[in-house]
Amino acid sequence: MLTKSVTSILQGITLAAKEFENNEAGARESLIAHSRALISALEVPSEFIQHTFWSQPALSAIIRLAADVNMFQHLKDAAGKGIDCEALSMKTGVDASLLSRLARHLVAMNVITFQNGAFHGTDLSDSLAAENYQHSIRFCHDVSRPSFNEFPEFFKSNGYKTPTLSGTDGPFQAAHKTELTFLQWLVNTHPYLQYFHSYMSVYRAGKQNWCDTGFYPVSERLLSGFDASVSDVVLVDVGGGRGHDLETFASKFSPLPGRLVLQDREQTIASMPADESRQFEATAHNIFTPQPVKYARAYYMHSVPHGFGDEDAIKIMANLVPALAKGYSRVLLNEIVVSEENPILAATNMDMIMLAHLAVKERTEAEWRYIFTQAGLKVVNIYSYPGVAESLIEAELA
């Protein structure tokens, strides 16, 4: 058997712990991966089944309920002293007998704690009290989970084949009883578009960003070669939602030598609140039409082409080509590049999300290079950071 021994896993944990203490890149993720491997090596099959089909589904359902009754907010408000079951029952409106059972499972799953007759929040549960995480909980439970639950029946009915790339006949449509694509459904089903954007805003929270030190060399590859006589635009975020990535970029490199431009669907741009302090321009743009901003230093996309099949992904990339200044403009794709030999959980998680919602997939390096080549571009380099699922693919005109 190729399964790692408990001894070798423990050795890996010891090494990763030392790296973590020294704040080495990827140490936290390595510790988590080794810890998961240890559990897998120690669990007997019955424990694995109970954990997979009882513990985790119950946990996600309780957390979704907790979002409805503001449980984590109340626990956070009681920081230090904690809150007993009767008082928490009064604040949440959940019967004390039921609440005690639900909360005990959260304690068993290390989400909250119980000490001296009172429930206490943790760093994790306090974080989950924030609005963007509350929205994320609702999105993942209400939208994603039913799509995963549909896998067995859907794939049985279609003969265990990959869904068509139309995006209108997959597990998501079967689960939500709709003929709309995932994105169309979000736009038409309030408030899930807002929840989705909140989820995307926290998707990489706490992880290294593409423009952080040690990831992509922004100053060397982007800013140092900026030429305002070619274009006064430094970076165009194509399909950038509400501008979370541009905000991060601006906060790290201001003052910038040129403009930042955000592009997304008209509905998304229209939903953005007015903000005079915003450091970028927000404009509506359809990614299936030619890029209107010409000769910018860079055109950036975060998790955009991965939501489409090869044909559409090539069209999206090709629409950038006429706007590029040869030898100057760069195309930057912040995407998962799946390792065929050592896939990490964060990458396969997103691949399953793509399968469930959009009938598409995360791509390997060879598959990404094919997309770029077919669009008239060439990959210059692929930048990665230890423990981070997404890479930064830099390309230019072929």
Curated annotation (Swiss-Prot):
Residue sites binding S-adenosyl-L-methionine per the record: D264
Assigned EC number: 2.1.1.-
Single GO MF annotation: methyltransferase activity
Enzyme class: transferase
GO biological process, one term: methylation
SUPFAM superfamilies named in the record: S-adenosyl-L-methionine-dependent methyltransferases (SSF53335), Winged helix' DNA-binding domain (SSF46785)
Catalytic reaction list: (4E,8E)-10-(4,6-dihydroxy-7-methyl-3-oxo-1,3-dihydro-2-benzofuran-5-yl)-4,8-dimethyldeca-4,8-dienoate + S-adenosyl-L-methionine = (4E,8E)-10-(4-hydroxy-6-methoxy-7-methyl-3-oxo-1,3-dihydro-2-benzofuran-5-yl)-4,8-dimethyldeca-4,8-dienoate + S-adenosyl-L-homocysteine + H(+)
Pathway(s) it belongs to: Secondary metabolite biosynthesis; terpenoid biosynthesis
Location in or out of the cell: Cytoplasm, Cytosol
GO cellular component: cytosol
Keywords from the UniProt entry: Cytoplasm, Methyltransferase, S-adenosyl-L-methionine, Transferase
Main location: cytoplasm
PANTHER family: HYPOTHETICAL O-METHYLTRANSFERASE (EUROFUNG)-RELATED (PTHR43712:SF1), PUTATIVE (AFU_ORTHOLOGUE AFUA_4G14580)-RELATED (PTHR43712)
Family listed: Belongs to the class I-like SAM-binding methyltransferase superfamily. Cation-independent O-methyltransferase family. COMT subfamily.
Biological function: O-methyltransferase; part of the gene cluster that mediates the biosynthesis of mycophenolic acid (MPA), the first isolated antibiotic natural product in the world obtained from a culture of Penicillium brevicompactum in 1893. MpaC methylates farnesyl-DHMP-3C (FDHMP-3C) to yield MFDHMP-3C. The first step of the pathway is the synthesis of 5-methylorsellinic acid (5MOA) by the cytosolic polyketide synthase mpaC. 5MOA is then converted to the phthalide compound 5,7-dihydroxy-4,6-dimethylphthalide (DHMP) by the endoplasmic reticulum-bound cytochrome P450 monooxygenase mpaDE.
Name of the protein in question: O-methyltransferase mpaG
Species this protein is from: Penicillium roqueforti (strain FM164)
